[in-house]
Design a protein with these regions (language model features):
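Phosphate/diphosphate-binding glycine-rich loops and adjacent basic-rich segments that engage nucleotide
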Residues: 157-219
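Short, ordered loop/turn segments at secondary-structure junctions
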Residues: 132-135, 178, 245-247
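A generic, well-ordered mixed alpha/beta core segment in the N-terminal half of proteins
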Residues: 94-165
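Glycine-rich ThDP/TPP pyrophosphate-binding loop and its adjacent helix/strand module
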Residues: 211-257
Length: 353
């Protein structure tokens, strides 16, 4: 009955009633589902981040959106919501390297990104990272946990303190519970549905950095990479590097070719990195636990131990991809010099003091 329907619609409240309409667009059947426009995707995620949709609604939306797969247009709208409502960092006058890796962490291979970030920052390349607490579905080790094991704590800091570290040392990590609590409200819903929703894709495409940058985004499946290119182009991301890294991260493997691509000024260039062609033959270090990783990580920062060769390869590759040097062999020489000089280790000591 129309009157009863209108009464119930009014009882939901404006935000929940509108969100129910948006659920209908992504959750209808094969022949009636229309998907969302960019503006509607922005609106839907904004309603969730501001708490104007309730838990059952958010769960329904996220799982329906996962099943039908977000379009690049929808991802662009959601990315704009993250940009507007999320934390913001700047590196005035300096081009930053910004990494997007899965928030649910690592549980099979030893992470290199904290060590890479420290050494790149020591070389004068600002690095901006972001992450959160252990996250569904993997609940792997997080960037914040890894840094903390090295004596560098990012959790519990104000955003101003993170910006100060970025200004002084060239390295930043925003922590979602502290710096983006609106996004943190989605974590219990993600836990309940037990699958990665499209929001997980945003964590690879978004960065809190504002200004000139090279955005480095990890991926696993080829369709994810092409959607990332389209979505980021739609929001005018100037320079993108996609990396088929370990466990969806941006860590380049040493046991196989590294598959990357650069998108700049609308042109995509596929770049394959073959470690064996440059004398890199180290096996891929496995993950065991934080304490063991800490020992190996501190050794690698001093050019020793089982992670050292993998770190050297990644450091060289990113020095070259960031155009710090013109040729990859030259980058390997520079990476070796930085590790032997313990540049990243020295920065860690300065930041942890």
């Amino acid at each position: 009955m129309p009157g009863r329907r209108a009464q119930r619609h009014g009882a939901l409240g404006e935000g929940r009633a509108r969100f129910r309409e948006l659920i209908g667009k992504v959750g209808s059947g094969e022949h009636t589902s229309t998907g969302l426009s960019r503006a509607e995707a922005y609106e839907a995620l904004t309603l969730m981040l501001r708490g104007e949709a309730d838990g059952p609604q958010m769960g329904a939306f996220l799982i329906a959106h996962r099943i039908r797969r977000p379009t690049p247009e929808e991802l662009a709208g959601m990315l704009e919501a993250y940009r507007d409502l999320g934390p913001k960092l700047q590196t005035p006058g300096r081009r930053a390297l910004c990494f997007g890796v899965p928030y649910d962490g690592r549980d099979r291979t030893a992470p290199l990104l904290p060590l890479l970030a420290l050494t790149l920052a020591a070389e004068g390349l600002p690095v901006v990272l972001h992450g959160g607490e252990p996250m569904p579905v993997k609940y792997g080790v997080t960037l914040a946990e890894l840094f903390a094991s090295l004596g560098l704590e990012w959790r519990g800091l104000s955003l101003a303190a993170v910006q100060e570290r970025l200004d002084r040392h060239g390295l930043a990590l925003t922590h979602q519970p502290d710096h983006f609590p609106a996004a943190e409200r989605l974590v219990p819903i993600r836990d309940a549905i037990g699958k990665r929703p499209p929001v997980a894709s945003l964590e690879l495409l978004w960065t809190p950095h504002q200004g000139q940058r090279l955005l480095v985004s990890g991926f696993v499946h080829p369709p994810t990479e092409s959607r990332a290119w389209e979505a980021l182009a739609a929001v005018s991301e100037a320079e993108i590097l996609t990396v088929k890294g370990l466990e969806g991260s941006t860590d380049l493997p040493t046991s196989r070719a590294g598959i990357t691509a650069r998108r700049r000024q609308g042109v995509v260039e596929r770049i394959l990195l073959h470690p064996r062609d440059h004398g890199i033959t180290a096996p891929q270090p496995a993950w065991s636990d934080v304490d063991s990783w800490r020992v190996d990580a501190l050794a690698a920062l001093q050019d020793e131990g089982p992670l050292a060769e993998s770190l050297r390869w990644n450091l060289a590759a990113y020095l070259w991809l960031a155009e710090r040097v013109s040729e990859l062999p030259e980058a390997l020489e520079r990476a070796t010099a930085l590790l032997r000089a313990r540049a990243g280790w020295r920065l860690l000591q300065a930041m942890a003091a």
